[in-house]
Regions:
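Fe(II)/2-oxoglutarate oxygenase catalytic core
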Residues: 1-154, 160-187
Length: 187
């Protein structure tokens, strides 16, 4: 595994986080569950906005997978972060599938907060394949830069980073998304 930093500790990748067989198995699992439409979260709740997001999604709660991936990711995660320490991954996994013409327009990722006060601060995104054209993850500050998907690479970025999943020109893109969870430390 090798780290590539794009913007300090706010946006970075860990290459070869998963191997090709692991990625293929995740794609198989997601396809076997079946993809559906992917709404966006607004102040009015979950809404369909195909002008913003037109890819498909599968959600799967899997605490065992969260623990397994967390053990592998721990050396690469930013901790402490401000007045919090990283404690694990969100067990709600989201598999995204993007087909030609699909994208996720510029947006900020929202935080997930547990009842015990743990809160996500960073997006945890694994590229499950790279045999497609287009589909890079584009960031807009500072300046515009993009991350080209590589099979098995983990992309970690701070939720308030404005970004988009660029349109797919050909092929199908698969990603696995979760969040890095943090707990506030005592002052």
């Amino acid at each position: 595994m090798k780290k590539e930093t794009f913007h300090y500790d706010y946006v970075y990748a860990v290459h070869d986080f998963l191997n090709n067989d692991e990625c293929s198995e995740f794609i198989r699992i997601a396809e076997s569950i079946g993809f559906g439409e992917a709404p966006i979260t607004t102040s009015q709740g979950q809404v369909m906005r195909k002008d913003v997001r037109n890819n498909s999604r599968v959600m799967k709660d899997d605490p065992e997978l969260a623990d397994q991936l967390w053990r592998r990711a721990m050396p690469w995660v930013v901790t402490p972060w401000r007045s919090s320490i990283a404690v694990g991954l969100n067990e709600r996994f989201r598999f995204y599938r993007y087909e030609p013409g699909q994208r996720f327009a510029p947006h900020f990722d929202g935080a997930f907060e547990r009842q015990d006060g743990e809160k996500s601060e960073f997006t945890f995104l694994i590229y499950l394949n790279d045999d497609f054209v287009g589909g890079e993850t584009r960031f807009f500050k500072p300046g515009v830069f993009h991350v080209q998907p590589q099979t098995g690479s983990l992309l970690i970025f701070h939720h308030p980073q404005l970004h988009e999943g660029a349109v797919i020109e050909s092929g199908t893109k698969y990603v696995l998304r979760s969040d890095v969870m943090y707990r506030r430390t005592e002052a």
